[in-house]
Amino acid sequence: RWALEYYGEKLTMATAFGAEGCVLVAMLAELRDETGIATDIFNLDTGYQFPQTLALKSKLEKRYNHSIRTIRPEETPAAAEARLGGPPCLKEPDVCCYNRKVVPLARALDGYEAYSTAVRRDQTPERQGIPIIGFDPRHNIVKIAPLANWTKEDVWNYIREHDVPTNILHEQGFASIGCWPVTRPVQINEDERAGRWAGSDKRECGLHLHSHLPIAGRSTPVDGLTAQTTKV
């Protein structure tokens, strides 16, 4: 709520329509109805999202009466596959994530002062130190992770209590859902992101690596924010 009231129309939210992202969409819709402030929401469409993921986007838009921007990379999937001889996420996964996610993110954030993301600290070791309110130096923007200290159980309890729409692939064993060529269901006792980039040791797309610096770590303040805002 603080972020919405503080930044207003200068706040945006990124979502890949994971369970956590759906929770934030629902929360922002509730806050919109309470405050009259609508938050921009966008999705980075790599061209390889599951059909079920795209169907969920439409369902969320209808349920919460809120349109969600689609941001696409400059190179189409067909052009990338013709150039590489197959899906780029299989041929050059790191470059693919950079070209189809990291670069488009810069366009999506243009004109905004802060953005919200649905990452949790307990998802991967790389995310354990994520502050609730930090700074993304690559895009010179405040980065807010409202669910940073939530657990998977917290997320699904909220979903059940508020009847939040989610991806039907979760019912088929997909814990974390990314691009269809490199995402598989997870097995019992596997890490929830074990199904991403299946067959490799890749764990992150790059959107959240080195992009969460505590406000306290900056040499200059960001819109008056202080070190206190990073404490949880």
Give a label for each model feature.
Residues R1-V232:
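Nucleotide-activated chemistry modules centered on ATP-dependent adenylation/adenylyltransferase
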